Amino acid sequence: MSESSITIRQASPGDAERWRELFTAYGVFYETDFDGAVLDGVWTWILDPEHPVTAFVAEADGTVVGFAHVRMQPDTFLAGPGWFLDDLFADPAHRGSGVGTALLEAVADHASANGGGTLRWITAADNERAQRVYDRLATRTTWVTYERETSG
């Protein structure tokens, strides 16, 4: 399958079941078991035009085979828009076919059409396959990511 046979579009209500399957598989890949509340909550965000998360899906032969979730966030270094790609996943059966590249290009086009700015994302240090794609499409930074859980 070539990249030209992949269609990228914004997620729609009819994608719910397949998105849930793929998002669950994404969680397994990162050793996370998403419960129903998380799946329902994220899907609600995706369908809410007022929520900052925008979801794109990749279709091949009429089947959703990947997704990307992106959100605008203020960039204090530029006093303008910035973008964060929260999630990107391709069905393992379709990896290497251009799904990830097509999704990233669609996300970048979306950011450009909505004010531009820097698009950032993270990946696991051992996700070398994804890093090979990302190294072709973006600049690897020297930033180190930290996390701290807060109550609320």
Language model: regions and residue ranges:
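Conserved GNAT acetyl-CoA-binding A-motif
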Residues: 112-123
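Short, low-complexity, intrinsically disordered N-terminal peptides in bacterial proteins
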Residues: 1-7, 151-152
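Conserved acetyl-CoA-binding loop-helix of GNAT-fold acetyltransferases
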Residues: 90, 96-109
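Conserved acetyl-CoA binding element of GNAT-fold acetyltransferases
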Residues: 80-92
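Conserved active-site alpha-helix within GNAT-family acetyltransferase domains
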Residues: 101, 105, 125-144
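Conserved G/P- and acidic residue-centered "switch" motifs that form tight phosphate/ATP-binding loops
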Residues: 62, 98, 127
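Acetyl-CoA-dependent GNAT
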Residues: 10-16, 21-80, 110, 141, ...
